Design a protein with these regions (language model features):
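Active-site neighborhood for divalent-cation/phosphate handling
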Residues: 2-34, 54-56
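Short coil/turn connectors at secondary-structure junctions
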Residues: 13-16, 38-43, 53-56, 174-175, ...
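A short glycine/serine-rich beta->alpha loop
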Residues: 15-18, 68-73, 89, 148-152, ...
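Conserved phosphate-binding catalytic cores of ATP/NTP-utilizing and phosphoryl-transfer enzymes
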Residues: 19-44, 195, 216-220
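Short acidic loop-to-helix transition motifs that present clustered carboxylates
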Residues: 22-28, 52, 184-186, 209-211
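A short helix-loop
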Residues: 40-147, 192-195, 218-243
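Adenine-nucleotide phosphate-binding core of ATP-dependent small-molecule kinases
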Residues: 137-164
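Catalytic phosphate/nucleotide-handling subdomain of diverse soluble enzymes
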Residues: 159-240
Length: 243
C-alpha cells in the first residue's frame, strides 16, 4: 500500500515529507524513551521473529540517545524458533505462543533437553541455530509428548533470556535492562530476570511487540522521553470512559 495514499484516507492534511524508522530501532526507542530514563544507562534487548531482516538486537541507551551494540539477522531468530515450536505443538503460530508456557507447567523439561540443545549454537551474546526455522519443525520428534516438549522449549527460552541478561550484567555492567519485541511477552522468562535481582530495574512497557512500534517510530525521530504514568495515559472517569 502506498503510504501517502493510506494517510490521505485519514484526512491528515498535506504531507511534505515521510520519514522511516527501522523496525528494531522503533522497538528500542519505545522501550528507552518510554522509561523514566533520565541520564541513567539502559540496555535494551529486542527479540522478535523477523524485524525486516534483524531478529535480535541489543541497544545501549544513555543521555537521551540509543546505539545498537549487537545485531543478529535472519534466519537465526529466537522468536521464529519459538513460533515454529508453537506450530509443532499443534498450536497456531504467531497467536498461541502464550499456550506453550502453560503446557510447559505440565511437562518434564529434561526429557527432550538434549534434543532442543542440539538445535542451537550459542556463544553469548550470539544465539544462532543449526537449522532453518522458516522451514518449520512440524516433523521434528514426531512421537514426542506435547507437554514434555513444551517444557523443554520454554526452559530453553528462559535459559537464553537469562544468558543474555548475565552477559549484559557481567560483561558490560548494566544495572537496568528493558526487553522489547514479541518475545518480551514471555512472562516466565522475564520474571526469572526480575527475581534474580541482578538488575536494579527491569522494564517491559505495555505492548512491547509491534503495536508499540508506532510510538517507537515517533520517539526514534523526536528523541524525547515520554511519561507513561498510568495516571496520565490511563486516567478514566468513574463510568470507565477516558477523559
Amino acid at each position: 500500500t502506498n503510504v501517502r495514499e493510506y494517510l490521505k484516507s485519514y484526512d491528515v492534511g498535506p504531507i511534505n515529507k515521510l520519514s522511516y524508522t527501522k523496525h528494531h530501532e522503533s522497538h528500542a526507542a519505545y522501550g528507552y524513551y518510554g522509561t523514566n530514563s533520565g541520564n541513567t544507562r539502559w540496555a535494551i534487548v529486542v527479540l522478535d521473529s523477523i524485524g525486516e531482516f534483524e531478529t535480535y538486537t541489543i541497544w545501549d541507551g544513555l543521555g537521551g540517545r540509543i546505539k545498537r551494540i549487537h545485531s543478529q539477522g535472519y534466519p537465526h531468530s529466537i522468536g521464529l524458533w519459538y513460533s515454529a515450536m508453537t506450530q509443532r505443538l499443534g498450536l497456531v503460530a504467531n497467536k498461541d505462543e502464550y499456550l506453550v508456557a502453560q503446557m510447559a507447567k505440565q511437562g518434564n523439561a529434561e526429557r527432550y533437553k538434549k534434543d532442543v540443545d542440539e538445535l542451537f549454537d550459542i556463544n553469548y551474546p550470539s544465539v544462532k541455530f543449526n537449522v532453518n526455522m522458516h522451514r518449520g519443525l512440524d516433523a521434528w520428534l514426531p512421537d514426542a509428548d506435547a507437554n514434555d516438549l513444551a517444557a523443554a522449549v520454554q526452559s530453553k527460552f528462559e535459559e537464553i533470556i537469562m544468558g543474555i541478561s548475565l552477559w549484559l550484567k557481567n560483561v558490560h555492567h548494566y544495572e537496568q535492562v528493558c526487553f522489547m519485541g514479541g518475545c518480551a511477552l514471555n512472562k516466565p522468562a522475564i520474571d526469572n530476570v526480575i527475581n534474580s535481582r541482578m538488575f536494579q530495574h527491569v522494564h517491559v512497557p505495555k505492548h512491547p511487540g509491534d503495536p508499540g512500534s508506532c510510538l517507537g517510530s515517533v520517539f526514534a525521530k523526536t528523541k524525547t522521553r515520554v511519561d507513561f504514568s498510568d495516571k496520565i495515559w490511563y486516567n478514566s472517569t468513574t463510568d470507565g470512559k477516558g477523559k
